UniProtKB/Swiss-Prot annotation:
Tissues where this protein is expressed: Expressed by the venom gland.
Keyword Signal in annotation: yes
InterPro entries: PLipase_A2 (IPR001211), PLipase_A2_Asp_AS (IPR033112), PLipase_A2_dom (IPR016090), PLipase_A2_dom_sf (IPR036444), PLipase_A2_His_AS (IPR033113)
Protein name from the UniProt record: Basic phospholipase A2 homolog W6D49
Signal peptide: 1-16
GO molecular function: calcium ion binding; heparin binding; phospholipid binding; toxin activity
Region feature Important for membrane-damaging activities in eukaryotes and bacteria, mapped onto this chain: 121-133
Main location: secreted
Source species: Calloselasma rhodostoma
Protein family according to the UniProt entry: Belongs to the phospholipase A2 family. Group II subfamily. D49 sub-subfamily.
UniProt superkingdom: Eukaryota
Annotated positions for site Cationic membrane-docking site (MDoS): 133
Entry's localization field: Secreted
């Protein structure tokens, strides 16, 4: 029940590029982002940090590090331009920071797609209690 409440809060507070990210994940993996990756492993989801449990979890750790490099925009609030072409994501934002945010989201969606074979349903709703300290970016 608590998990459903958390997911509901996340859905209500969505704006900017988060919607773009969710759409990228859906197109690239065929999986609904919040349900399948919103609390996955030790690094997917808000305020989660820890040693990645598998390749899918590593995708989230890399995405967090990518976002940390952005200094002139807030990728969770500001939207950017992109399109899908021949199964690939093409970022087309003129603002350099937002274009980099798009590239970060493209990278994680592509990483999820490339690691579908390592996706572990047992990690889908990981609370982070058993996550060890992560290395810095």
């Amino acid at each position: 029940m608590r998990t459903l409440w958390i997911l509901a809060v996340l859905l209500v507070s969505v704006d900017g590029s988060m919607f773009n990210l969710w759409k990228m994940i859906m197109v690239m993996t065929g999986k609904e982002a919040t349900k399948n990756y919103g609390m996955y492993g030790c690094n997917c989801g808000p305020m989660k940090r820890g040693k990645p449990k598998d390749a899918t979890d590593q995708c989230c750790a890399d995405h967090d590090c990518c976002y940390k490099k952005l200094t002139d925009c807030d990728p969770k609030k500001e939207s950017y331009s992109y399109k899908f072409e021949k199964g690939e994501i093409l970022c087309g934002e003129t603002n350099p920071c937002l274009n980099q945010a798009c590239e970060c989201d493209k990278a994680v969606a592509t990483c999820f797609r490339d690691n579908l074979d390592t996706y572990n349903k047992k990690q889908q709703f990981n609370t982070g209690i058993f996550c060890s300290k992560a290395k810095a970016c």
